[in-house]
């Protein structure tokens, strides 16, 4: 027989499982509704521009570009997200139409696109579940990087091969794209030296903040992704060495 503690744990697990099942059912119905809306007859002749986002946290990489489109044009943005709780659904902007699509429907949605342009921060187009459209072959696929590092050092081989246009965060990255094309023998892409909107936003927000001076200096530890980075190799010693020195 279960003792009281075990019984409570079991009840909590069963409750969590039931909640997860209910949420999954709700999200499945939501995805079905948005998928149907996306391919509605109303959209068929009017859909020009599609953004794809992996989740709510990715909007910040699109933000500056989207705001420029809203300010300078009347183009409707069809914003597809894999996150049912994406903050995009709370935006009251008539030029943005958001859709939640689950992973299974995302595969067919991408293959059936008939828009003119797709913008995404997700690399590896055509290599995994996200494919170019099989219905309209001349869609322009734009890759907008969500980092500001080396494409060659951080992505898989061929991660950008199937994009038509790269929004480069720097001139160095633009040069790197050309060198990758030469090395792999792939077709030349359009390159737009776009910069990195997230940093632009951070600078703007800082300038508007009045530049407050913190009483304590804050140390930001930012490990890289490679093997034996700070987190794996020396984090404990590093943090211990900073104790009691007046830092936050």
Descriptions of predicted regions:
Residues 38-44, 150-155, 214-216:
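Short amphipathic alpha-helical segments, especially helix-boundary/capping motifs
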Residues 50-203:
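Active-site and donor-binding regions of nucleotide-sugar-utilizing enzymes
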Residues 32-34, 141-147, 209:
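Short, functional N-terminal and low-complexity linear motifs
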Residues 1-50, 71:
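Non-catalytic N-terminal targeting/anchoring module and adjacent flexible stem/linker
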Residues 10-14, 28, 32-36, 87-90, ...:
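Generic detector of well-ordered alpha-helical segments enriched in charged/polar residues
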Residues 58-74, 197-248:
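Conserved catalytic-core segment of nucleotide-activated headgroup transferases in glycan assembly
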Residues 45-49, 139, 216-219:
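Nucleotide donor/acceptor-binding cores
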Residues 43, 135, 160, 212-213:
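Short, flexible hinge/linker loops that cap or flank conserved catalytic cores
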């Amino acid at each position: 027989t279960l003792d009281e503690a075990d019984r409570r744990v079991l009840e909590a697990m069963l409750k969590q499982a039931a909640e997860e099942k209910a949420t999954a059912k709700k999200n499945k119905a939501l995805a079905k509704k948005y998928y149907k809306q996306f391919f509605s007859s109303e959209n068929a002749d009017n859909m020009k521009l599609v953004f794809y986002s992996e989740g709510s946290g990715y909007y910040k990489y699109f933000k500056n570009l989207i705001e420029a489109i809203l300010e300078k044009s009347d183009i409707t943005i069809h914003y597809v997200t894999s996150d049912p709780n994406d903050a995009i659904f709370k935006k009251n902007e008539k030029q943005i139409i958001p859709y939640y699509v689950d992973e299974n429907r995302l595969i067919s949605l991408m293959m059936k696109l008939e828009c003119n342009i797709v913008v995404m921060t997700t690399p590896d187009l055509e290599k995994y579940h996200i494919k170019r459209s099989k219905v309209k072959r001349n869609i322009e696929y734009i890759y907008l990087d969500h980092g500001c590092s080396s494409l060659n050092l951080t992505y898989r081989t061929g991660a950008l091969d199937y994009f038509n246009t790269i929004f480069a965060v720097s001139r160095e990255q633009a040069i790197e794209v050309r060198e990758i094309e030469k090395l792999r023998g792939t077709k030349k892409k359009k390159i737009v030296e776009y910069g990195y909107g997230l940093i632009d936003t951070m600078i703007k927000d800082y300038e508007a903040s009045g530049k407050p001076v913190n009483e304590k200096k804050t140390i930001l530890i930012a490990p890289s992704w490679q093997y034996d980075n700070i987190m794996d190799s020396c984090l404990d010693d590093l943090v211990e060495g900073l104790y009691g020195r007046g830092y936050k």
